[in-house]
Amino acid sequence: MLARGKTNLKIEEIRMHKHHEIHRVKPLMPALCRIRQGKKVINWETHTLTVDNNQIILFPCGYEFYIENYPEAGLYLAEMLYLPIDLIESFQKLYTVTDQIRNKTSFFLPQNPELIYCWEQLKTSVSRGFSTKIQEHLAMGVLLSLGVNHVNHLLLSYSKQSLISRCYNLLLSEPGTKWTANKVARYLYISVSTLHRRLASEGVSFQSILDDVRLNNALSAIQTTVKPISEIARENGYKCPSRFTERFHNRFNITPREIRKASRE
């Protein structure tokens, strides 16, 4: 069963009034982005994609994206749907992907009436605090409306069993905790040397994962809440606001205040 208390499934709204650019954004969970107004330009690896309110964007974990958001008539409005790995793995067990489609890459699809209907139903269930099982059932409808093969290829690119994914899930549960490699290794029931060795084999370091989680989680909070930036910094493990601003700017090439400024009319 999927439902074991509170789900990680969530929908967040991004509302901006000025053009802005954010570098090296790395989704911490598989996500869908529905543009409601304006357009988004996405760059990753050697690809560039421009998306408006006629398409849905599929963001898999494991990629870094360079993003520009452009308002239309003074407003950029988008909704992000974050999907827990458990739910997607259950979807994969229920619906089979074909190898022929698995190897194709496309990070956007046209919106369709089924998708819009299922999305609105899911959004209502989340806003009203409906049960976890109901939310997961409606999320399955959203995934089905995209097409089984697209979901499997684009949203299942990150295995729950990978050490990176396990570290993401652990750190994201309490990003403000004073995490060390030793503490994470104890939680995962492995030695710290094994942790470092296996992360290196997956092409990352412990510090890079910790930075990914804290900075991308902070970015989401800055875009979707009105919390003070200093509070967001503390919640993500940064006691010094100026240090947080420096790390944030080095990562995203934009400061927290510049993002907040873009959100004001």
From Swiss-Prot:
Keyword DNA-binding (UniProt): yes
GO biological process: DNA damage response; response to antibiotic
Record-annotated DNA-binding residue ranges: 182-203, 229-252
SUPFAM superfamilies according to UniProt: Homeodomain-like
Entry's Gene Ontology molecular function annotations: DNA-binding transcription factor activity; transcription cis-regulatory region binding
All copies of domain HTH araC/xylS-type, residue ranges: 165-262
Record keywords, A-Z: DNA-binding, Transcription, Transcription regulation
Top-rank lineage group of the source organism: Bacteria
Record's keyword annotation contains Nuclease: no
Additional notes on this entry: Encoded by the cryptic lambdoid prophage DLP12.
PANTHER family in UniProt: HTH-TYPE TRANSCRIPTIONAL REGULATOR GADX
Protein name listed in UniProt: Uncharacterized HTH-type transcriptional regulator YbcM
Gene name as annotated: ybcM
